[in-house]
Amino acid sequence: MRKLLWLIAVTAIASIASCSRLTHGDAMSHNSAIPDTLRVGTLYSPTSFFLFRGDTMGYEYDRICSFAQSKGVATEFIIASNLQSLIAMLDSGVIDVIAYEVPITSEYRKQVLNCGSENITYQVLVQPKSDTLITDVIQLINKDVYVEHKSKYEARLRNLDEEIGGGIRIHSLDEDTITSEDLIERVAKGKIPLTIVNSDIALINQTYYRNINIDLQVSFPQRASWAVRKDNQALADSISAWSELAESGTADKQMLRRYFEMSKSGALPTGLSDAKSIISAKHGIISDFDIYFRRHGQDNGIDWRLLAAIGWVESQFRSDVVSWAGARGIMQIMPRTARAHGLELENIEDPNLNIQVAANIIKTLDHILRKRVSDPDERRKFVLAAYNAGMGHILDAIALAEKYHKNPNVWNNNVQEALLMKANPQFYNDSVCRNGYFRGRQTVEYVSNVSHYYSLYCSKIKK
């Protein structure tokens, strides 16, 4: 269940992605198979390793951190541009382990020693949920299926078409920036009827789009796992033994649920109306927390109605909300961010303190972006995007906009489009990017939603 790519200097990645402290001592830990600092190679992807709101995340990332912590060793992460680069790093001794899915095939077995939990994936059909689901590949005859041009999905679909005697209407999309996630979104929104993607990508996207079905497998299974050098049987055995125990534990089940089951939709719940976002326009009351929005807005030079709009979109003014990523409270503050602002986890859901930290963050983001985007109304969109995604991804999007002839000072149809490009390895591996893969669609939607409610509040509530 995972996948993707990029190359950054070792020291840069080590500084942002270490998930455990360096323990002093000999070159090797008390377990002679494991060095005191485990050098981990991986690729940016929605399943293995990515940055979100300043935190490092990913199913493979969490699991390798758990392994290292169980052994009492530190970690250093090195991000490669592709799987062959990772294997070359492993072979040359730059890294100790690949925490990314390496296919278990005769070809790869000549180069690496697979270890740890095996993950089995398939190519699956993505279709809208309905009462008339396609449940057999034969039913694809006379159906329109859309796939990426010259992709493994197109190759499999053409083979399948031959196997069943023809009749599948195959649409090979040759678009520069298209990804599997784009095609899944098009199915979810009714723009295309069917597509084919890997099951791990399908599982993650099902947490964003609950109206799709991914049950029909259309390929043979592919086995994959982590890998070490062929001469490092001791480390392989240690990882495999840990994996066997971890799979039955609560922590591993929680990781699976976090990345592959919990809803990640950035959209507001259905049934919410503009009227429900305001207690009383007549009396100038947006929420029960207006006193805090006003106080911390004034202290930080921020329109309190903007803070309220963020609070509504983030949590619908509920202080007990916890997101899949661990963000908490009315303003959905990440625990790591809270600690950086002196707010301990036990107090993170306190409305006053939660809103105070959010206001401080927004003030800081505005200060950083002021040098790049002079127009305050335009800059507000950038600030909202950075609040939702993390500043690093927005700076990447600005850099991509500059490189690919878009206006880096304008959000709509310019930097927002560049942010969407960061879901594609062609662009997040670009030399101007420093923060890797990012799924930008939810951030684009977030900016639009907050802007809508801010405009609504400004039209109905006095400052």
Where are these regions (language model features)?
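Substrate-binding/active-site groove segments that recognize
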Residues: 149, 320-346, 353-364, 450
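Periplasmic-binding protein-like
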Residues: 42-46, 117-131, 200-243, 262-264, ...
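Export/targeting segments at the very N-terminus of extracytoplasmic proteins
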Residues: 263-317, 352-355, 369-373, 462-463
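Extended ligand-binding regions for polar small-molecule ligands
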Residues: 58-70, 129-153, 201, 220-266, ...
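Extracytoplasmic small-molecule ligand-binding "clamshell" domains
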Residues: 19-102, 106-110, 171-178, 239
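Bilobed "Venus flytrap"/periplasmic-binding protein-like clamshell domains
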Residues: 39-69, 103, 124-178, 283, ...
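A ligand-binding cleft/hinge motif common to bilobed small-molecule-binding domains
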Residues: 84, 99-110, 158-159, 185-220, ...
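Catalytic and substrate-binding regions of cell-wall glycan-acting enzymes that process beta-1,4-linked
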Residues: 378-456
